[in-house]
Amino acid sequence: MSQRRRYIPVLIAIAAVLIIAAVLLVVFYPRKKEALPVRYLASSSTGVPYYYRNEDENRLIRSSELLTRGTQVIDLQKDYTENGIQYAVVECDGQSYYIMRSALVDDPQDIIQETQVWVRTSATVYENEEGLQIASFAKKGDCLDIVGFDEMQKDGSIHKYQIHFTDSTGKDVTGWVYGKYMVPTEEEALAVNTDYYEIHKKRKYSAMELYGGEATTLDWYPVEKPSFASNPICENASAMYLNVACIQEIDDYIALARKNGVNAMVIDIKDELRLAYPCEEIKELSPLAYNNPFYGSAEYYKNAVQKCLDAGIYCIGRIVTFKDTVFSADHPEACIESSVSTQTWPSAYSRECWYYNLVLATAAAKYCGFQEIQFDYVRFPEQAYAMSESGDADFRNLYNEEKAEAIQNFCFYAADMLHEQGIYMSVDVFGECANAYVTAYGQYYPAISLVVDAISAMPYPDHYSRDEDTWTDPYPIMYDWARKASLRQSEIPTPAIPRTWVVAYDVP
């Protein structure tokens, strides 16, 4: 019995040692792993090459796959040199990789190693990381020096670059551009999307110069069309248009919509004469517009839109864009000057006018709940040909764009700004622009459809010449127009949802 008792303290001591050892193992082993430095994969492109060791050949083999730049890895502090190149062994998601030591950085701001980017798709340069303010415009082929960036996307691409360059006017500019329009080399920037460029490059209105521009100067790269989970787009719209006065009878129009299968409403935010309501955000931009709205109460207008939303109706806010008598009165410097016409018309080249309309669009979408903004009169005046032919017109063309370029560039700007808010963007166009030429007023159906979420053409009977019998026998004419529009849709990689306007007013 006494011998047994002598072993008890020994056993207790052994057990205590084992417990202490186990505790130390649990406590200190993870700390050792955590003590290893965490680094980030860096590159001048979205992917970082990695290597694995071929034991038979006693060398590193490059994988055909890439790791995404910006990925966090654990530096295992095991370096290996081969052919004068230093490699580090890193761990990521439980796997070990050989990575070039030069591809590891400590600071997330050092993840991007490119110092310059080139413009593939002409792009708006923004004053700030966020916001609508326009600093300048970068043209296809321009080289931009990188100053910084905002955020890394999941695929390693950059959302926005902060850049510095000298623009086409000679202005020294520091601003922000969307990374999706940039490429790493000048060769890639100057390249065109050949499959679609070849279709459009010879498009011309017979031998006559319309001064609308050449399709060769337009962008034909695919544009990713968003889908917002909290705001699904209306794919098959049966819509009704309500001008500003109709808001007063909104209950009657909702009842009419329910009775006739209408699932969407296009509601005026601004027509060519006035705002629907006093929008605070544009008060300083156009005092005349702010002080002379159709309805004095913003709340009254908002409540009418809300009734439509509550009824399950998809609400599209309409903005007359480049035909605006009130903005023109406040900003004559943004308007076209010409001896051909006495009508005051803001120029589609004017970034001041772009900005004003997008401030209004984003504010109305946020305040009233519009799910989509539809821009009408996204063009130059009908007299644009005569203005250009006269030779004395000042179109305020600061960046030396062709008319069709300006229209497409506005669409890029507007779509980007609205998409940031989860709002869709659509444009109204003349039926004529579905023809295989760029119109004198700058509209070319495929160039617009490529960019926007929905496109609404207006093949109205009264838009045709008097030689065509559009009122008593419209079907052949409308069929021919629809055939052309369908062809234009097939000539681009990312066509918009087509929603054609139908005339519902009395025949003459």
Task: Enumerate the language-model features and the residues they cover.
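SH3/SH3-like (including bacterial SH3b) beta-barrel domains
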Residues: 54-69, 127-143, 148
